[in-house]
């Protein structure tokens, strides 16, 4: 209906804002965290090392962020802002793909999925280009330094694996001894990627994984 079409229009506008901001606006957002991430990406490329000796790490290794990917695109483009923007957009697409598959696992309607994407892609930014240290949703997940984009991917992958396992178990119970392995390939692939991303986040952020991933998995 008209409401669904309007929701799709909102999603397109949100996506356009995210893409434009990442490709053309990052140089105007140089808060402490963002500028540190940009500098780290430059040094990663210059030193050809994921942990450059010329950069003093103050919190995490930054491996579970767009920074390593941004370093690659910086080397290709010669522009750290464009390189970081491209890296952010790629990770945003990955987040969207996993989020879509997760919502599909719940058998949601197209309207419900569209509503979910409106919330996911909301480009919330702090007003007036606040640059002291922008910690808005956009800066943390969708653009700028994107500190939590890879962490979000990791958590969405794990949640997707859990939901798939639950649905697989339910199908097995309903089918009795009948073979229900037709979706095993997708499940195994998601388990592999969830494991790899969890390891990456564990190496980079340590205690974050223990609190947000390992403890919930143990309880599960």
PLM feature spans:
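Juxtamembrane segments of multi-pass membrane glycosylation machinery
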Residues: 46-50, 68-91, 95, 107
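Transmembrane-helix motifs of polytopic, lipid-linked glycan transferases
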Residues: 8-10, 86-116, 122-125, 157
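Membrane-interface transmembrane helices that cradle and orient dolichyl/undecaprenyl
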Residues: 155-189
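Membrane-proximal lumenal/periplasmic loop motifs of glycosylation machinery
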Residues: 23-32, 45-68
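Membrane-interface alpha helices of multi-pass inner-membrane proteins
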Residues: 179, 183-217
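Membrane-interface micro-motifs in multi-pass membrane enzymes
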Residues: 30, 63, 113-166
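Helix-to-loop transition at the C-terminal end of transmembrane segments
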Residues: 14-35, 130-133
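Start-transfer (signal-anchor) and selected internal transmembrane alpha helices
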Residues: 1-19, 110-113, 186-191
